[in-house]
Amino acid sequence: MNSISASAIVLWKNTPLPFVVKSYPMSTLTTDWQHLANLALADECLSRDQARAVLQAPDTELLNQLAAAYRVRYHYWGNRVRLHYLLNAQSGLCPEDCHYCSQSKISTAEIEKYPLLSQEKILAAADRAAHLKAGTFCMVISGRSPSEKVFEQVLAAIRAVKERYPLKICACLGLLTPEQTARLAAAGVDRVNHNLNTSENFYSEICTTHTFRDRDQTLANIQAAGITTCSGGILGMGESDDDVIDLALFLRQRQVTSVPVNFLIPIPGTPLGEQHTLNPRHCLRILVLFRFLLPRQEIRIAGGREVHLRSLQPLGLYAANSMFIGDYLTTPGQAPHQDWQMIADAGFVLEDPEGRAIAP
């Protein structure tokens, strides 16, 4: 060893480092997450303690959790991503007091308020959905339940869209009777959405003008009519981990087909306008839990994706297999070309209405 290199070594050894590199042991939980994936693949339900462990795991376990969730997602859905397009077909003026909603009677948020759109405008929105490569066109109207006049107009719009486009149609119309769900089935609707939003235990904290059981009865009416159900929740409203688990378990018991996972967008003028409790890592853990507890279901990253997942949006697709493209009810979404690029960059492909893979 020459004198220069020896001196350099002595200098290096005697020079204090400006920072300390902390050593972390290799994960001891990776096998546990894979065990949970095995349970999901065997259609076995996680215990409550196992579900809590998913939500309460340290951030250092997040990639291991996502890897386990992706095994389940890939088993049932491959690397395909379903796109849904949302139309706010009737906005505002709702008599309900849902604390999260900018369209409720107690909201002072500045939003557009309008009656049901004309069939021409609904068809124009369906055309945009098709051009954005969405497989499902979601028609949403504000209000507790539709009047007979509005309901007839919605049925006519459903028929018109089905005649012109290969899109699947999901209708979100509020509380529905058995007679109304039977008429929706006859009109050719593919799916009806009615979100439970949170657990039964927490429900009275976010709404007092109707109950969790009112919403569940609508789901029962939809299923009795032979229509597939879409129902999920809004996370980040102040609920506990057990409330999140209870919601997912109830959706599993109800055997819903499609599960939108919304993350609260705190809108000024609503009672939850200052509610800021989520971070991107916890949102991803919620998606992992929903995949473990609802392994066969379509899990959709819905409202709040851009706000809460931010730069980690692509990671959500390792647990979820579906997302909205375009705007939400009263808040903007990410530009469609950014969504397509994100999907392609992550190595996923789109799914058309018939379940075939297409390029983003």
UniProtKB/Swiss-Prot annotation:
The keyword Metal-binding applies. [4Fe-4S] cluster binds at C94, C98, C101. InterPro entries: Aldolase_TIM, BATS_dom, Biotin_synth/BioAB, Biotin_synthase, Elp3/MiaA/NifB-like_rSAM, rSAM. Binds 1 [4Fe-4S] cluster. The cluster is coordinated with 3 cysteines and an exchangeable S-adenosyl-L-methionine. It catalyses: (4R,5S)-dethiobiotin + (sulfur carrier)-SH + 2 reduced [2Fe-2S]-[ferredoxin] + 2 S-adenosyl-L-methionine = (sulfur carrier)-H + biotin + 2 5'-deoxyadenosine + 2 L-methionine + 2 oxidized [2Fe-2S]-[ferredoxin]. Residues 79-305 form the Radical SAM core domain. Pathway: Cofactor biosynthesis; biotin biosynthesis; biotin from 7,8-diaminononanoate: step 2/2. Keywords: 2Fe-2S, 4Fe-4S, Biotin biosynthesis, Iron, Iron-sulfur, Metal-binding, S-adenosyl-L-methionine, Transferase. SMART domains: BATS (SM00876), Elp3 (SM00729). [2Fe-2S] cluster binds at C138, C170, C230, R300. Gene3D superfamilies: Aldolase class I (3.20.20.70). Its cofactor is [4Fe-4S] cluster; [2Fe-2S] cluster. The keyword S-adenosyl-L-methionine applies. Homodimer. Belongs to the radical SAM superfamily. Biotin synthase family. NCBIfam families: bioB (TIGR00433). Catalyzes the conversion of dethiobiotin (DTB) to biotin by the insertion of a sulfur atom into dethiobiotin via a radical-based mechanism. This is Biotin synthase. It comes from Thermosynechococcus vestitus (strain NIES-2133 / IAM M-273 / BP-1). The lineage of its organism: Bacteria, Bacillati, Cyanobacteriota, Cyanophyceae, Acaryochloridales. The gene is bioB.
